[in-house]
Every structure is written in C-alpha cells, then in structure tokens.
A protein has these predicted regions:
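A detector for short, charged/polar N-terminal pre-domain segments
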Residues: 1-9
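Short hydrophobic alpha-helical segments that form membrane-spanning helices or hydrophobic packing faces
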Residues: 28-32, 94, 128
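N-terminal helix-turn-helix DNA-binding core of bacterial DNA-binding proteins
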Residues: 12-53
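Canonical helix-turn-helix DNA-binding module
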Residues: 40, 44-72, 76
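Basic, amphipathic "hinge/linker" alpha-helix immediately C-terminal to the N-terminal HTH DNA-binding motif
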Residues: 22, 73-94
Length: 148
C-alpha cells in the first residue's frame, strides 16, 4: 500500500481513494458491511482473511472514518463495526464495481449475485454519470481540472 503521508499531498481523488480502499480486503470489508456484516468473526469467516490483516484493515477504515466501533446491537459483550456516514457514502462506488463486474466478468448464464431494490423487487438500474441536462456522460465528454 502507498505511504499515507505521501498520499496526503496527492492531488488526485482517485489515488487517495485507492490508497484507502483499493486493496482487496478493505473493499471487501466495506462490501460486507453494506451487506449487514458487523462482527470481526463474521468478516473473517466471509473473507477467509488472516486475523492480523483483518485487524489492520479494520483499524485503517476506522482511522479514516469509514467504520466505527459500537457496542453490540444485541446487548452482548461483543463490539460491532458499523459504517459511518462517510462509509455509507461509498455505496455508489460498491454499486458501480458490482455492475461493472456483472456486465464484464460473468459468462451468459453463469451464476452471480444481483443488487435488488427491496421496495420494487427489481434489479437496480445501471448507474451512469450524467450531465446537468440529464444526458449520459462518457469519458470523452469530460476533463479533469485541478482546483485549489
């Protein structure tokens, strides 16, 4: 992983995001948190990750304000990792990755998961960036500008 002190001066938002959640485990922890996982043991069983690596990634996500530790919701002595508002704001990132994967990484008819709107029971529509007038934007219609 890139040195966080070096990333502090990085002007690219994508590079800073990748520094925080770009490794396999951090992104999958966030995915599992959106799926309702909260306890260390549950993350470990789901991901099959070594305890020391999981501890490190959970700490990094807490230090960044993506997760917070709370007393267990069932009143037991356990503690739970819960997405903060900052963590919840990663939902579109997870959805975009999921949808890209659905479209590009599975053969026709191959079993995979879908994200469903609980209200309608329908698969959520494909996400795409849009211009102020509502037209879908492509990379060729955009440019990066540095701001202070």
């Amino acid at each position: 992983m890139a040195n966080s002190k070096l990333m502090k001066d990085e002007p690219c938002p994508v590079a800073r995001c990748v520094n925080l959640i770009g490794d396999r485990w951090s992104l999958l922890i966030v995915r599992d948190a959106f799926d309702g996982m909260r306890r260390f043991g549950d993350f470990q069983r789901s991901l099959g990750v070594a305890r020391n690596i999981l501890s490190d990634r959970l700490k990094k996500l807490m230090d960044a304000g993506v997760l917070e530790l709370q007393d267990a919701s069932d009143g037991t002595a356990f503690q739970e990792y819960v997405l903060t508002a900052k963590g919840e704001s990663l939902f579109p990132v997870i959805v975009a990755l999921r949808q890209w994967g659905e479209q590009n990484l599975f053969e026709n008819g191959e079993c995979h998961s879908l994200l469903i709107d609980k209200t309608t029971g329908q698969q959520i529509p494909f996400m795409a960036p849009v211009a102020a007038d509502g037209t879908v934007l492509r990379a060729s219609n955009t440019e990066v500008q540095k701001v202070k």
